[in-house]
């Protein structure tokens, strides 16, 4: 069992706080990589995920990006840390948690993009000014901050 699964065996479905990381990966055309997730069905979000024991937020970001996309990322730049009442998440099994999401930006990536896990339906390079309607609300906030703070390509 992983850390979160082991924790859940002890506390059940109670709300908890979990740290995680996400990454805005920007290509040479200024588009960003978005992930269409299986749950909530079809929702678009930034690639990323939850921290494992002993990881830094950067290590979490690098691991999650590779696991989900097959891409290796480097030169991560901190965008911000996002948390609060609006960051309540839930899983299909009823588990709930508040995420503390550390968001990074990079244009340093290599590898072949592919759906590598059981969480994803697809990946697309998307114009950050034209997000899909079903983009996660919390990730819209992160992408909005990205658009406000990044005036030129990384």
PLM feature segments, named:
Residues 103-107, 114-145:
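NUDIX/MutT-family hydrolases
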Residues 82-112:
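Active-site-adjacent beta-strand/loop module that shapes the phosphate/pyrophosphate-binding cleft
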Residues 72-82:
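A short coil-to-beta-strand element that immediately follows conserved catalytic motifs
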Residues 17, 42, 96-100:
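Residue-level preference for beta-strand/loop junctions
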Residues 1-22, 94:
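Acidic, metal-coordinating catalytic segment for phosphate/diphosphate chemistry
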Residues 25-26, 34, 106, 125:
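Conserved hydrophobic "DFG−1" position in protein kinase catalytic cores
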Residues 27-68:
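Conserved Nudix-box catalytic region and its N-terminal flanking loop in Nudix hydrolases
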